[in-house]
Amino acid sequence: PIVLMLMVFMNVVIKLIGEERINSLAQRFSKYSLVRNCILPFLAAFMLGNPASFTLGRFLPEFYKPSFYAALAQYNHTSNGLFPHINAGELFVFLGIASGVETLGLSTTPLAIRYLLVGLVMNAVGAYVTDFTTAYVCKKSGIQLSKTAKVQ
């Protein structure tokens, strides 16, 4: 039910702000790879959680959607230590590792911070690789994906 509520809320916000404004904002965000591959997926995961965060990808140009989804899927896991609301269904992975750290008498906070920081870097690298892979596949298959945002 919460996913449905978040999706309805997002659609209401889109209607209130207007699709043209959302499109222009998405166009500005998609220009810069750091924003597109690091900041936007993290904000989507933090605000909407998994799986509702994937709906924000609809505002990005078709060419950048694969890298956004790749980064977002990874952010949903690597942010769990500090922000368990993002992906509560898979919190057991972090908690299993954290219980081993606690058994050693160590704090889990540094582990969660390192997990997040390493995740931020590796997710961005994965998204960049996905951008190159998308360009390669498009070139080989003769498909041209749009680099301008359009919402239907």
What are these regions (language model features)?
Residues I39-L40, K150-Q152:
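Cytosolic juxtamembrane regulatory segments of multi-pass membrane proteins
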Residues A52-V151:
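C-terminal transmembrane helix pair
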Residues P1-P61:
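Membrane-embedded alpha-helical segments and adjacent helix-loop junctions characteristic
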